[in-house]
């Protein structure tokens, strides 16, 4: 049914410097400086190239939808292979919220609308609303959804796979 592999952060750490304080809201560290963030993204890209040599990846999905202004600027300036950022359409604390557009720096802003393999009525409503508004369907699945009981692992792979197939047919 198609699909695309993208980058989802180095060690699931958002691209944020020490000027961001997550407090008790998110369990993340910040990067010491921009050079450390840049090194992490380079390593992430090399890992992707080594792991999937025949796949061209161009989408960056911020961990927990968090992407600081400094991190966003660094991606645009230093990583031309990243041509799309897929974060969040809906607001949330620390979220990098997007509209569907091409930014002034040329990066495509393409928010994700739904995610996971537990497709409930809210997800269907959100997906249908987006289809009506922009004629777009965007869905994201975390690789570790298969291991996280809160995100469907308790259902088992066959049920999760069936849910995704049913969603695509829907």
What is the predicted role of each segment?
Residues 75-170:
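C-terminal active-site subregion of NodB/CE4 polysaccharide deacetylases
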Residues 1-70, 134, 139-147:
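Metal-dependent polysaccharide deacetylase catalytic core of the NodB/CE4 family, i.e.
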């Amino acid at each position: 049914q198609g699909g695309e592999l993208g980058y989802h952060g180095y060690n699931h750490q958002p691209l944020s410097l020490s000027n961001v304080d997550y407090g008790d809201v998110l369990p993340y560290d910040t990067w010491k400086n921009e050079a450390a963030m840049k090194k992490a993204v380079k390593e992430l890209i090399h890992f992707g190239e080594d792991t999937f040599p025949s796949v061209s990846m161009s989408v960056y999905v911020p961990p927990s939808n968090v992407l600081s202004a400094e991190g966003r600027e660094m991606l645009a300036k230093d990583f031309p292979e990243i041509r799309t950022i897929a974060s969040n359409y809906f607001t949330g604390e620390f979220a990098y919220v997007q509209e569907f557009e091409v930014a002034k720096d040329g990066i495509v802003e393409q928010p994700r609308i739904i995610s996971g393999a537990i497709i409930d009525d809210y997800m269907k409503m959100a997906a249908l609303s987006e289809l009506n508004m922009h004629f777009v369907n965007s869905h994201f699945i975390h690789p570790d959804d298969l291991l996280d009981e809160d995100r469907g692992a308790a259902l088992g792979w066959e049920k999760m796979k069936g849910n995704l197939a049913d969603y695509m047919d829907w």
